[in-house]
Amino acid sequence: MEPAFHAALSRGLAALALPVAPEALPRLERFADRLLAWNRKVNLTTITDPAEVAEKHLVDSLLLLPLLDEVRTLLDLGSGAGLPGVPLACARPALEVTCCDSVAKKVAFVKAVAAELDLPVRAFAVRAEGDPEGEKLPRADAVVSRALSDPERWVPLGVRYLAPGGTLFAMLGREADEARLAAIGAASGLALVDVSRFELPLSRSARAIARWRAR
């Protein structure tokens, strides 16, 4: 991978104080390399500049890392090319990650890269519609989606996949109204824990992550 990738990844991790161990960096680089290689044959991402991949896929995914606390299992719904699930597994190999997406070629990529990197990641080609048993998807300590960024759609769906005492995350690409997020969570029996705000250092793009738990 070219120097711009390494510079963007290092700068993002340092600027945001993300707890990524040095031994995780080769896994993250390999994931990015395989993502771009597969993308030449199948459409996995519109972001192809290596520095942008580092910031907008890897660093953006890893914003969740300090918020996972004692989470042991994570379900990534609508994961696409495994984002954020695979980068999180790269950084925290003890985390058991399940990715699901309705697009078979994206699921095939996630399975292949997880096997190549020896990560505890499972992937299923299924559309999540709120029936974990029927869809054969596990309930998890943490449930997240980058694909569904509208909390009014995401929260009522995601809550159905939470294990008892679990945490639901919404990854938002814009400023978030905490009163609105609290009300959305309350309608699904969840209490808003907090909203963490970030700025990606290269693009200056705003990010917010909302976190809810059962009342």
From Swiss-Prot:
It is an enzyme of class 2 (transferase). Its EC number is 2.1.1.170. Its main location: cytoplasm. Gene3D superfamilies: Vaccinia Virus protein VP39 (3.40.50.150). GO terms for molecular function: rRNA (guanine-N7-)-methyltransferase activity. It comes from the Bacteria. It catalyses: guanosine(527) in 16S rRNA + S-adenosyl-L-methionine = N(7)-methylguanosine(527) in 16S rRNA + S-adenosyl-L-homocysteine. One of its GO terms (cellular component) is cytosol. InterPro entries: rRNA_ssu_MeTfrase_G, SAM-dependent_MTases_sf. S-adenosyl-L-methionine binds at residues 78, 83, 128-129, 146. It is found in: Cytoplasm. Keywords: Cytoplasm, Methyltransferase, rRNA processing, S-adenosyl-L-methionine, Transferase. The keyword Transferase applies. Specifically methylates the N7 position of guanine in position 527 of 16S rRNA. Belongs to the methyltransferase superfamily. RNA methyltransferase RsmG family. This is Ribosomal RNA small subunit methyltransferase G. It comes from Anaeromyxobacter sp. (strain Fw109-5). The lineage of its organism: Bacteria, Pseudomonadati, Myxococcota, Myxococcia, Myxococcales.
